C-alpha cells in the first residue's frame, strides 16, 4: 500500500526531515495498563533493548530459562532499530525464577522482573509512550503549526507501512493467496497476510472519508465508538444531531471497518459509503470470508495523548506522546513532515 496516496487530515506537509537517524531517536516504552500481581506461575521481565527484535529476545530468554520457546510470550512486536522497553512473560509452573542478574545479551538490559498470575498475550497492552527526535527539518514554522493542529484535532489512525511488509509485499502475497496462485501453510504468514488485507481496507475507507471531509461528520448508520473503548453502536437517523455533538466533544469516535466474514456493522448511508469504497476489493474480501476472520471496527481519527515537543534548535525537534495499542507513531509523524528516510521501519502494537 502506497501511504502517499492516503489523504492527510491537515494537508500534505511542507517540511521534510529525518526520523530515526539513529536508534536513540525513536524510544518506545510499553504501558501494560495494569499492575502485575506479584505472584503466580508466570514471570514478567521488563527489558530495554536496541539492535535486536522482539522474537529474537524471546527465543534467547527461553534458552536462558531452559524452557520451550512457546512458553515465552509478549504483548506486541517492537522494531530492532529503536530503543524499546518491553515486557516478556515466562511461564514457569512449579519452577524457580532464573537468576536474571546473569542474563547477558548485547543490546539488552533487564530492568525488572515480577511474578504474574496470567499469561501476557498479544494485544494485552494498553499502549505505548513514544519519544522521537526529528532531524534536518526544512520548515520549522509549518511543523510548529501542524503540531498545534495535531494536539487539537489528532491525525488519521492509519496502519503504518510496517503492517504491509517491505515494499508492501504482505499485501501482494495476500492477493496471490486469495487467487489461489500460492499456498500459505505457515500460521504466522497467514496471519500477516490477513492482517495486511484488513488494514489496507481500513486505510482505504478512512482515506476516502477524509477526502470527502466526512471523517468527523456523523452519517446515518455510522458505527460509533466510545472514546477509549472497543464497543460500538449504530447511529440512528433521529439522533444524528445529538451524536454529532458528542463526536465534536470527543466523547465518540467515528469508525471504519476491519472487515471480517460477517457484516461490516454499519447501516444506511454509512454502509453504502463503505461498500462503494470496497467495490474493487472483492478478492481480499473473499479471502477474509474464506478464512473466517472475525470483523472489528477502529476509530478513523486518533488524538495522541500527553503530546509535548521541544525544539533543540531550528532544525531538530524532540516530540513525545502516548498512543493506544495498535496505533502507529509514524502516522503521527506523517502529518508533521515528509520523511527523507521513508524506509525507516515503523513501530506499534
Curated annotation (Swiss-Prot):
Provide the binding site for substrate: 26, 128, 328
State the similarity comment: Belongs to the pseudouridine synthase TruD family.
In terms of InterPro entries, this protein maps to: PsdUridine_synth_cat_dom_sf, PsdUridine_synth_TruD, PsdUridine_synth_TruD_CS, PsdUridine_synth_TruD_insert, TruD_catalytic, TruD_insert_sf, TruD_pseudoU_synthase
Q: What is this protein called?
A: tRNA pseudouridine synthase D
Q: Which GO terms describe its biological process?
A: tRNA pseudouridine synthesis
Record keywords, A-Z: Isomerase, tRNA processing
Entries under PROSITE patterns matching the protein: TRUD, UPF0024
> Could you name the Gene Ontology cellular component terms for this entry?
cytosol
Q: What is its EC number?
A: 5.4.99.27
Reactions listed under catalytic activity: uridine(13) in tRNA = pseudouridine(13) in tRNA
Say if the entry is tagged with keyword Cytoplasm.
Answer: no
Q: Where is the active site?
A: 79 (nucleophile)
**Taxonomic placement:** Bacteria, Pseudomonadati, Pseudomonadota, Gammaproteobacteria, Enterobacterales
Q: Which PANTHER family match?
A: TRNA PSEUDOURIDINE SYNTHASE D
Any idea where the TRUD domain is? Answer: 154-302
Q: What does this protein do?
A: Responsible for synthesis of pseudouridine from uracil-13 in transfer RNAs.
Task: Cite a single Pfam family from the UniProt record.
Answer: TruD
Q: Which terms in the Gene Ontology molecular function aspect does this entry carry?
A: RNA binding; tRNA pseudouridine(13) synthase activity
Amino acid at each position: 500500500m502506497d501511504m502517499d496516496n492516503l489523504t492527510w487530515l491537515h494537508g500534505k506537509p511542507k517540511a521534510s526531515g529525518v526520523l530515526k537517524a539513529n536508534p536513540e531517536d525513536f524510544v518506545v516504552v510499553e504501558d501494560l495498563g495494569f499492575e502485575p500481581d506479584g505472584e503466580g506461575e508466570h514471570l514478567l521481565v521488563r527489558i530495554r533493548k536496541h539492535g535486536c527484535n522482539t522474537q529474537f529476545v524471546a527465543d534467547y530468554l527461553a534458552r536462558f530459562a531452559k524452557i520451550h520457546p512457546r512458553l515465552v510470550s509478549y504483548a506486541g512486536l517492537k522494531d530492532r532499530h529503536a530503543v524499546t522497553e518491553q515486557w516478556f512473560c515466562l511461564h514457569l509452573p512449579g519452577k524457580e525464577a532464573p537468576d536474571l542478574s546473569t542474563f547477558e545479551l548485547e543490546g539488552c538490559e533487564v530492568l525488572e522482573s515480577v511474578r504474574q498470575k496470567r499469561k501476557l498475550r498479544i494485544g494485552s497492552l494498553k499502549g505505548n509512550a513514544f519519544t522521537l527526535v526529528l532531524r534536518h527539518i526544512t520548515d520549522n514554522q509549518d511543523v510548529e503549526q501542524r503540531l498545534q493542529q495535531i494536539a487539537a484535532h489528532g491525525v488519521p489512525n492509519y496502519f503504518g507501512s510496517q503492517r504491509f511488509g517491505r515494499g508492501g509485499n504482505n499485501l501482494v502475497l495476500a492477493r496471490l493467496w486469495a487467487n489461489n496462485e500460492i499456498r500459505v501453510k505457515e500460521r504466522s504468514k497467514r496471519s500477516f497476510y490477513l492482517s495486511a488485507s484488513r488494514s489496507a481496507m481500513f486505510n482505504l475507507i478512512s482515506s476516502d472519508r477524509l477526502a470527502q471531509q466526512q471523517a468527523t461528520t456523523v452519517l446515518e448508520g455510522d458505527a460509533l465508538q466510545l472514546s477509549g473503548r472497543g464497543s460500538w453502536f449504530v447511529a440512528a437517523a433521529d439522533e444524528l444531531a445529538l451524536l454529532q455533538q458528542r463526536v465534536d466533544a470527543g466523547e465518540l469516535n467515528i469508525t471504519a471497518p476491519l472487515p471480517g466474514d460477517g457484516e461490516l456493522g454499519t447501516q444506511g448511508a454509512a454502509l453504502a459509503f463503505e461498500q462503494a469504497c470496497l467495490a474493487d476489493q472483492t478478492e481480499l474480501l473473499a479471502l477474509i470470508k474464506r478464512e473466517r476472520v472475525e470483523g472489528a471496527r477502529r476509530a478513523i481519527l486518533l488524538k495522541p495523548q500527553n503530546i509535548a515537543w521541544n525544539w533543540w534548535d531550528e532544525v531538530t525537534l524532540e516530540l513525545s506522546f502516548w498512543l493506544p495499542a495498535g496505533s502507529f507513531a509514524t502516522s503521527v509523524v506523517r502529518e508533521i513532515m515528509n520523511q527523507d528516510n521513508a524506509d525507516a521501519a515503523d513501530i506499534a502494537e
